């Protein structure tokens, strides 16, 4: 079976989408021979990459979605259930060419991302952040060397041209194309969610709570499979390895998890610089505290942090591609900020975490519950950070029964087998479609 998927990064970089597809591919291969075809959409062109039973193509090798599917000829196409321009182009082409389409809930820890403070996210702030992002000279996954004038805006226009050319290839009415163009730009300006894609042949959902949402859009129950979240499989197997570090002398080892608030247009360059200088400066005041940092694996620049450390005279280690679970047992406490799926992972594994308040950002799923269970402590002022670290270091923490109940409520079948269930559903759908075509 040839399965086509899309990514914003070459899959040697391990973002959430890449991890999702790798989990599915691993589960599929246990059942049937499966070739995973990647199409990467990014501004820079690259040559085709071959890796065992995976092939990686550049979006710029194709004129539009129809051209792409004709050349790659997949058996199935896996796309999100929202209409992102490139992947929606593939779904339009798939409908025209008769190639089956499977929708998935997205490469997220959970679709209900935010906790109780979500109402604090103002639409005005989101709109401003959206346009700040568009005017940036880099995409989130770019290095400093890739920075070019309005690179992000120009690539946004490239994606939309690709989408328009696909619509013309499938003979969509020109007035409808214009209407959709206008609607999408209004949605972008207001930071509205991408439109729901109701034209897919089957849907893989994270949990039962999503079923009603899909049926609201007219998706019949027979087109839906609730499989759980494949991203959680790896977390399920790794959280049992998380341990408390053995105390050595009076030293406290801190690992700082940064957040790409600047790269996503929420912070300005100066805001990021000021926050980090204040954070590092405060930690340096206590000689018993040693710290290193873990930056985002794809969206943050290691070069930036190396330059900042040199400017501040810091010798801390900078981790980027390393797995969270390979690092945290070497540290007593995690210090973090912003809004990140990493916060949900830290909640799940019960690692001592201090969350520094930043603006009025919401919390991700399960973080509020972890705060209530005292697995996560909040810091609202840098003046309180050092005493909080020492107090938390002496405290013993355990997963409470109430916390475990909430975890099981939020995550459908948190058992490490979601990838297998998704693979079983994909294969069953594939065989059904194949028998119909024969």
Segments predicted by a language model, with ranges:
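A donor-sugar binding/catalytic signature common to diverse glycosyltransferases
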Residues: 76-89, 215, 321-367
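C-terminal alpha-helical cap of glycosyltransferases
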Residues: 414-438
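Conserved catalytic-core segment of nucleotide-activated headgroup transferases in glycan assembly
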Residues: 14-26, 231-308
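Donor nucleotide-activated moiety binding/catalytic core segment of transferases
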Residues: 54-72, 297-343, 348
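N-terminal pre-catalytic "stem/leader" segment of glycosyltransferase-like enzymes
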Residues: 1-133, 139-154, 263, 268-269, ...
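Catalytic binding pocket for nucleotide-activated donors in carbohydrate/polymer assembly enzymes
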Residues: 338-414
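A nucleotide-sugar donor-handling region in carbohydrate enzymes
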Residues: 136-264, 401-404
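Catalytic donor nucleotide-activated moiety binding site of glycosyltransferases and closely related
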Residues: 38-55, 160-171, 257, 280-321, ...
